[in-house]
Regions:
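Short hydrophobic beta-strand segments
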Residues: 1-15
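Conserved NAD+-utilizing ADP-ribose enzyme module
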Residues: 10, 16-25, 32-116
Length: 116
């Protein structure tokens, strides 16, 4: 499982729009490698320069590690990304607080240099 922009607490924090989703959560991609996740994101959104910039750093983890950190993942395919997942917390928005996010962040390994 891969998070565009890395696995830092700041990048795992819910954005305003993500708090309105049902259930609230952040995007992940299931891909064989961080490089592949970055490539898929760039191909799916060719004009999204901000996403392309963010995709230079990828946070990678496993479903097992996410669950050990107290979170979960749900399949959430989109028209452009069939391998899109949503990372959620059982307590919803309230579960995305700094203590939980620090535990979640520790489950990620970051790689960089995924060229634009």
């Amino acid at each position: 499982m891969h998070r565009i922009g890395g696995g830092s607490v700041e990048n795992l924090r819910l954005k305003a729009r993500e708090t309105t989703l049902n259930p609230s959560g952040i995007s992940l991609l299931r891909a064989p490698s961080p490089e592949e996740a970055a490539r898929q994101m760039r191909e799916a959104f060719p004009a999204a320069e901000g996403l392309h910039e963010a995709a230079q750093v990828i946070g990678s983890t496993t479903v097992e590690k996410i669950r050990q950190a107290g979170f979960d993942v749900l399949p959430n395919p989109t028209k452009k990304l069939l391998n899109h997942y949503r990372l959620i917390h059982p307590e919803g928005v309230a579960g995305f607080h700094d203590v939980n996010l620090a535990r979640l962040s520790a489950a990620f390994t970051e790689t960089s240099g995924h060229a634009v």
